[in-house]
From Swiss-Prot:
It holds the Pfam family Aminotran_1_2. It catalyses: L-histidinol phosphate + 2-oxoglutarate = 3-(imidazol-4-yl)-2-oxopropyl phosphate + L-glutamate. Gene3D superfamilies: Aspartate Aminotransferase, domain 1, Type I PLP-dependent aspartate aminotransferase-like (Major domain). Homodimer. PANTHER family: HISTIDINOL-PHOSPHATE AMINOTRANSFERASE, HISTIDINOL-PHOSPHATE AMINOTRANSFERASE-RELATED. Pathway: Amino-acid biosynthesis; L-histidine biosynthesis; L-histidine from 5-phospho-alpha-D-ribose 1-diphosphate: step 7/9. This is Histidinol-phosphate aminotransferase. Its EC number is 2.6.1.9. Keywords: Amino-acid biosynthesis, Aminotransferase, Histidine biosynthesis, Pyridoxal phosphate, Transferase. GO terms for molecular function: histidinol-phosphate transaminase activity; pyridoxal phosphate binding.
Amino acid sequence: MTTPSAELPALARIRDDVRAMQAYVVADATGYLKMDAMENPFGLPPALQAALGQRLGQLALNRYPGTRQNDLKAALAAYAGEPAGSAVLLGNGSDELISLVALACARAQATVLAPVPGFVMYAMSAQLQGLGFVGVPLTADFELDEAAMLDAIAQHRPAITFLAYPNNPTATLWDEAVVQRIIDAAGAQGGIVVMDEAYQPFASRSWIERMRAQPERNGHVLLMRTLSKFGLAGVRLGYMIGPAALVAEVDKVRPPYNVSVLNTEAALFALEHADVFAAQADELRAARTELLAALRAMPGIERVWDSQANMVLVRVPDAARAYEGMKARKVLVKNVSTMHPLLAGCLRLTVGSSADNAQMLTALQASL
């Protein structure tokens, strides 16, 4: 006779904080327009789909991943413009890289610091690896509160400071001078700074330019990107660039063979056709401009924030009502209104194709 899982004595062996958590669940989006996950709406052209399929079909799937990953690291270094003295670390998505950095720094009393609201994986990875987490609220305009950040760094001496550039869910690209002063402060007390550039394809600048121009001020910075927003969310490939000595230490806690031969080859293929994805990003940036204008002209929208990503944050009178109304009209967006007090009344909208954006706008207007 099978014992009901709720009564299993073995459950007592699971950490209390883990048992209190909720597993991440991807809702069934069949029949819906997905505008909730910042995915690239464009697929590969048919000819490239066929070429990729043929290439993947020739892989030795009976063998563990090998030196082809070195080819991918070299290709990513060239694509990103890797600073001198740097190295590349691959991850099964950037989520894994966040966890690896936290694991490598997980000592008693160690702390992770990040602005909030921000990407939820920073706090979750800190919790799961046994580090403390300090969230420093942004300003009401979702800018960095420089004084509060510097005070928190001085007080908590964080092992890791995460800065999403641009930020999620606010799509904010923070002031360079402020960011550099925060990086300086973190470095002065021996901390690591992770610049999370998941949305770099849609931003007007990258921190890697600073890393090349001022290596001495950014020698403790790890820059993290993903191919998800490049257009390969289904492939799950993240990469981290930073000082070779620092990357080598994080690499020690990486599981062997963490990136499959399929992921590796698909990423190499994408980089060989980077012009296709660059054109898609250009189209999405143009669609973002149109979307921002339409949202600002829409009656009932209380505020629309500028965006440097493939998402737009808006404030509406009743976020829950608007979300449910859009869902009833077969459009999924992200209701972030309960994630943090600063996000009260806010929805996060993905920037899609012009046709997708038009459908989303119609659903939003009808749901306000």
